[in-house]
Design a protein with these regions (language model features):
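Short, hydrophobic-biased segments on the C-terminal half of alpha helices
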Residues: 146-150
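C-terminal helical "lid" subdomain and adjoining coupling/linker elements of P-loop NTPases
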Residues: 1-109, 117-126, 133-144, 154-167, ...
């Protein structure tokens, strides 16, 4: 499947295929066509396509990722995942050690890919080690993405954590509601 990292196919065939409307073969092909086209248009030079490289800010990709979900995920994406004024972009611009790798944005994309279809499941979310697996390119330090994950978990409105598991929900966290 090179250059597509196996973690993408694991997420699509394990998590996304549980959605009623998501057709395993057609859904995967449609999504990956949109993802590859978006990366090609942007001139992406990464050696692998990881969950972190899925350009959720691209309207075509976003449409493929939200069309199968029952709830309205667009506000979540715009605020906490990959919008032009999103928290990950803000953190990446404020913190050069994270911004050099777009670490917060890559963490947010990976969590979305691994958690959006499983919000109704008993075991929600994606483990922190799978987040790093979906983000880190050869030669990069996993610790940078661990730092980005911690910062995202403490500041994001729709990001939940239970032990090593992280997931997005369409409902804001109680902590963020209390702060607002």
């Amino acid at each position: 499947a090179y250059p597509i990292h196996p973690e993408i196919f694991d997420r699509l065939y394990t998590d996304w295929s549980t959605l009623v409307k998501f057709q395993r073969t057609r859904g995967v092909l449609r999504l990956m066509a949109a993802v590859i086209h978006s990366l090609w248009e942007k001139g992406d030079r990464n050696p692998l396509i990881l969950p972190a490289n899925v350009a959720i800010d691209d309207p075509r990709v976003q449409s493929e990722l939200t069309r199968y979900l029952s709830d309205n995920w667009v506000p979540v994406i715009e605020k906490d995942v990959d919008g032009p004024n999103s928290l990950p972009l803000k953190l990446d611009s404020e913190l050069p050690n994270l911004g050099k790798f777009s670490a917060c944005r890559r963490v947010a994309r990976t969590i979305y890919m691994g958690s959006a279809p499983t919000t109704a499941a008993a075991h929600k979310g994606i483990e922190d080690r799978r987040v790093k697996l979906g983000c880190v390119m050869p030669g990069e330090s996993p610790a940078v993405f661990g730092d980005a994950l911690r910062r995202m978990a403490s500041a994001a409105t729709y990001l939940y954590q239970d032990g090593p598991h992280y997931w997005y929900s369409t409902q804001p966290t109680v902590t963020k509601l209390a702060e607002d």
